[in-house]
């Protein structure tokens, strides 16, 4: 079996029983289970959810996305070996740590396979909850152009690139395109202030005003938990994106939870600590791949300018990246995952067949 066979690239064609369209995202695919299968699993497995709660199978792929495009490698290597397993292992570790420390639950009910979660359907809060401890990336680019206010927060003059900020900044952006909210542009991923969210509590899908305080608290506490844990491995937690949503427990009580993924190289920037102390930035996240793309293509504006999306999609479609680049990403993801979980990561030899076998034999979900 060659390297490409060990990579799960297409994850929306599994024979999982569903009566709804499969939702296929950039990296994950979601299979909504039938009412009968959801109810059966809740009863048989003892999940702490209402008896009629909708459940889904979430399958992560090894695809690599950046700048809103999915990128492919040469020699048929159209994903990054071990990437999906690494992302899920990291999220599983942090979600468990959050729960153990009394922060909040996640949407994950069961983990049948390293690439698979069984999740409870959540009502998502419509913000990307971003926390920044250092000024870098898009924030630094805006700062160099003279911007000093970010999401309603004014930051001081005289900051330098990659400098630690005076305090952890919460700089949320919209999740999807929100319409009819005064003062909020109708575009995906636009920055919003705390006052914007307070003016449109329901528009951002919060149940009540007090939950804005709660999400900020959970974001800060979650950031600190991950930052402290990574520091033990001499890694710097630079910035991250969390997502939140609402679910009901078995007693019918609504609760705000963490969802999607947390503290991964896809959703966060992580720097090597010793290199940072020497004034060098060694990326331990997808940011290294983003920087490689910016340096690789002569007209990097295509990757940064949202008015050139058609050109960007064509760039990703028509260029096969060197296998060495895909393997460098693999080494980064697997390496940081093994630091986080404290053990060797087991990479599937034949992931698609393994998933089908487990979901058939242990969950009776294969048609």
Curated annotation (Swiss-Prot):
Matches recorded under InterPro entries: SAICAR_synt/ADE2_N (IPR028923), SAICAR_synthase_Vibrio-typ (IPR014106)
Coiled-coil annotated residue ranges, if any: none
Alphabetical UniProt keywords: ATP-binding, Ligase, Nucleotide-binding, Purine biosynthesis
GO terms under cellular component: cytoplasm
Pfam families registered for this protein in UniProt: SAICAR_synt (PF01259)
Single biological process term from Gene Ontology: 'de novo' IMP biosynthetic process
EC number: 6.3.2.6
Keyword Ligase in record: yes
GO MF annotation terms: ATP binding; phosphoribosylaminoimidazolesuccinocarboxamide synthase activity
Highest taxon, organism lineage: Bacteria
Metabolic or biological pathway, per its Swiss-Prot or TrEMBL entry: Purine metabolism; IMP biosynthesis via de novo pathway; 5-amino-1-(5-phospho-D-ribosyl)imidazole-4-carboxamide from 5-amino-1-(5-phospho-D-ribosyl)imidazole-4-carboxylate: step 1/2
Catalytic activity annotation: 5-amino-1-(5-phospho-D-ribosyl)imidazole-4-carboxylate + L-aspartate + ATP = (2S)-2-[5-amino-1-(5-phospho-beta-D-ribosyl)imidazole-4-carboxamido]succinate + ADP + phosphate + 2 H(+)
Family recorded in the similarity comment: Belongs to the SAICAR synthetase family.
Family annotation (HAMAP family): SAICAR_synth (MF_00137)
PANTHER family for the chain: PHOSPHORIBOSYLAMINOIMIDAZOLE-SUCCINOCARBOXAMIDE SYNTHASE
Protein name, UniProt field: Phosphoribosylaminoimidazole-succinocarboxamide synthase
Source organism of this protein record: Shewanella halifaxensis (strain HAW-EB4)
């Amino acid at each position: 079996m060659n390297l490409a066979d060990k990579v799960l690239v297409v994850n929306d064609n599994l024979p999982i029983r569903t009566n709804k369209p499969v939702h296929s995202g950039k990296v994950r695919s979601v299979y909504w289970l039938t009412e009968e299968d959801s109810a059966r699993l809740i009863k048989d497995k003892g999940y702490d959810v209402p008896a009629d709660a909708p459940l889904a199978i979430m399958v992560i792929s090894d695809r690599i996305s950046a700048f809103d495009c999915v990128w492919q490698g040469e020699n048929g290597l159209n994903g990054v070996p071990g990437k999906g397993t690494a992302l899920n292992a990291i999220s599983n570790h942090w979600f468990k740590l959050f729960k153990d420390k009394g922060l909040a639950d996640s949407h994950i009910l069961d983990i049948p396979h390293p690439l698979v979660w069984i999740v409870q359907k959540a009502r998502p809060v419509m913000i990307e909850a971003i926390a920044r401890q250092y000024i870098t990336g898009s924030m630094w680019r805006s700062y160099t152009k003279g911007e000093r206010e970010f999401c309603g927060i004014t930051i001081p003059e005289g900051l330098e690139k990659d400098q630690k900020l005076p305090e952890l900044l919460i700089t949320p952006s919209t999740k999807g395109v929100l319409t009819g909210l005064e003062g909020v542009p109708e575009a995906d991923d636009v920055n919003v202030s705390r006052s914007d969210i307070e003016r449109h509590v329901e528009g951002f899908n919060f149940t009540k005003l007090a939950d804005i305080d709660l999400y900020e608290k959970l974001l800060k506490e979650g950031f600190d938990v991950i930052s402290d844990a990574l520091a033990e491995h001499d890694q710097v937690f630079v910035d991250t994106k969390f997502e939140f949503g609402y679910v009901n427990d078995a007693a019918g009580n609504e609760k705000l939870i963490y969802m999607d993924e947390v503290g991964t190289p896809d959703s966060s920037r992580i720097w090597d600590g010793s290199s940072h102390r020497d004034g060098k930035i060694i990326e331990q996240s997808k940011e290294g791949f983003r920087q490689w793309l910016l340096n690789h293509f002569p007209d990097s504006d295509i990757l940064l300018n949202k008015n050139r999306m058609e050109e960007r999609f064509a760039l990703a479609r028509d260029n096969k990246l060197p296998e060495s680049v895909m393997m460098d990403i693999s080494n980064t993801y697997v390496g940081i995952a093994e630091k986080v979980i404290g053990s060797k990561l087991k990479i599937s030899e034949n992931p698609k067949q393994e998933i089908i076998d487990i979901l058939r034999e242990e969950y009776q979900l294969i048609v």
